[in-house]
Amino acid sequence: IRMRRFLFPLCSVIALTSFVQAQSPDRHPLYEPALVSAGATGDAGNLFAGAKVTASGHYGNDRPELAVDGQANNAGKYWGCEGIPVWLQIDMGKPRALSALHVWPYWEGGRIYKYKIEGSEDGKNWKMLADQSSNSIAATSEGVPFKFNPQTVRYVKITFLGNNAGNDK
């Protein structure tokens, strides 16, 4: 999910070479998740494109599936949610060897997001793919790339634990 501003929370992950973007300067100002896209070794596409997406909720028309719609340059489409923690879960339909993710949280205002990204083959037993629960670095327009040894997962879940915007909405 490449988000210009991974409405992060939302959640965004990137594949090795593919990005999905979401976010808009007109988004709900209190709590905006990131966008996500994912890739696998040897796979140049966004593994999250067309995937089933569920979330703990959404704000207005900022539906979960907008976090992985592949419209990286459409600033008017993103996933937004209020409350902490909030989560976004992506079902790729079948287990895939995932080796990279890229998250694009909303970066204006120097926001610092705390979140974790987990993967699962069955949607019940989760393994950590990326842990930003102690993050102290502000989000930027480059997003946050994560590379790791290939992990076989069907589901990817990003859980936003907080931000420094003065509220958890």
Task: Mark where each language-model region is.
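A short beta-strand element within beta-rich, extracytoplasmic domains
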Residues: 96-109, 158
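Bacterial N-terminal signal peptides
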Residues: 9-18
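Disordered, acidic Ser/Thr/Pro-rich linker "stalks" and the adjacent N-terminal cap
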Residues: 23-94, 106-111, 131-140, 148-150, ...
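Short beta-strand elements bearing conserved aromatic residues within extracellular beta-rich modules
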Residues: 115-117
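Surface-exposed loop/edge segments in extracytoplasmic proteins
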Residues: 124-131
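Bacterial N-terminal signal peptides that target proteins for export
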Residues: 1-8
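Short beta-strand-plus-loop segments that form exposed binding edges in beta-rich domains
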Residues: 159-167
